[in-house]
């Protein structure tokens, strides 16, 4: 059986993860660092192109073997690209950095100017602009909400609270975001939200954020594209601008430029780089 595009030393472990029965389904594996630049090292993702879909359990096994925070799986069927995203704890419903890394891989391989990925949750469009990639994402309405009692003491400094897919705490300063101390055990108890985001204005031209999703195995995400679906529309309104920059204050850091595309969508511009050696 062939494991095309794999470094030899990684081929056998991945075959074992598939019980030696499906190795030929894997066409190519890459690792991309996404949302890099401006002293930010971004968020790594695995990108796997498959000849066809494997079972959910096999995709999850491969994700664990690849060992990145998220792995994007792509198929190319009847001229259409399809995508699914898996974190270490299982499948997730939308991943910005996984989408952009997958887009960078496909645009390079097929020499395309843009690519449309079809997913269970709608289309994701990736394009290349100079040294940046663009990712069109939905704009999520900010709905006022109460702080769940499980984390009420974590929100004592919040100056605003709202919800989308995620729970968002708006803090008074960049320093407050940097110094925020989460509690993974209590965050796992908030069943109605995907993750907790803390954010603050960063002058008049942008904002900062941190993103916590222990329910899906991500204690603190390094750089989160989908968080901009929640934050960009809020800060467009608050800061009176349709184009902002965002910085994620994680251990490695993430850098984004965001623009309002329509009333229902935003565009995220960012850099992504393929690692010199694929796994």
UniProtKB/Swiss-Prot annotation:
Which top-level enzyme class is recorded in the Swiss-Prot or TrEMBL entry?
Answer: isomerase
| Pfam families noted in UniProt | PhzC-PhzF
Provide the alphabetized UniProt keywords. Answer: Isomerase
* Residue runs in coiled coils: none
Q: What GO terms fall under cellular component here? A: cytoplasm
Q: What GO biological process terms are annotated to this protein in UniProt? A: biosynthetic process
The source's superkingdom equals Bacteria
Q: Does the keyword Isomerase apply?
A: yes
An example of a GO molecular function for this protein is:
isomerase activity
Question: Is Metal-binding one of the keywords UniProt gives this record?
Answer: no
Q: What is its EC number?
A: 5.1.-.-
Q: Which PANTHER family match?
A: PHENAZINE BIOSYNTHESIS PROTEIN, PHENAZINE BIOSYNTHESIS-LIKE DOMAIN-CONTAINING PROTEIN
Per the record, the similarity remark reads:
Belongs to the PhzF family.
UniProt-recorded name of the protein: Uncharacterized isomerase VC_A0395
């Amino acid at each position: 059986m062939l494991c095309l595009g794999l470094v030899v030393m990684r081929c056998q472990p991945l075959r074992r993860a598939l019980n030696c029965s499906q190795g030929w389904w894997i066409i190519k594996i890459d690792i991309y660092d996404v949302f890099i630049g401006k002293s930010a090292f971004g968020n790594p993702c695995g990108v796997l192109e498959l000849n066809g879909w494997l079972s959910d359990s096999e995709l999850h096994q491969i994700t664990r073997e690849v060992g990145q925070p998220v792995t994007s799986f792509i198929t190319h069927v009847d001229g259409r690209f399809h995508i699914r995203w898996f974190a270490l704890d299982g499948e997730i419903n939308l991943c910005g950095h996984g989408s952009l890394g997958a887009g960078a891989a496909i645009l390079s391989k097929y020499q395309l100017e843009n690519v449309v990925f079809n997913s269970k949750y709608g289309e994701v469009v990736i394009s290349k602009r100079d040294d940046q990639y663009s990712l069109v994402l939905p704009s999520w309405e900010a709905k006022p909400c109460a702080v769940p009692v499980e984390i009420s003491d974590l929100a004592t400094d919040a100056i605003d609270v709202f919800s989308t897919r995620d729970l968002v705490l708006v803090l008074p300063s960049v320093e407050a975001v940097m110094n925020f101390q989460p509690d993974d055990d209590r965050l796992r108890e908030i069943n109605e939200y995907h993750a907790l985001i803390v954010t603050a204005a960063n002058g008049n031209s942008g904002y900062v954020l941190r993103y916590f999703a222990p329910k899906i195995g991500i204690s603190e995400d390094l750089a989160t594209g989908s968080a901009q679906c929640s934050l960009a529309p809020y800060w467009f309104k608050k800061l009176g601008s349709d184009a902002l920059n965002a910085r994620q204050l994680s251990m490695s850091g993430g850098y984004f430029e965001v623009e309002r595309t329509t009333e229902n969508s935003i565009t995220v511009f960012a850099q992504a780089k393929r690692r010199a050696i694929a796994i």
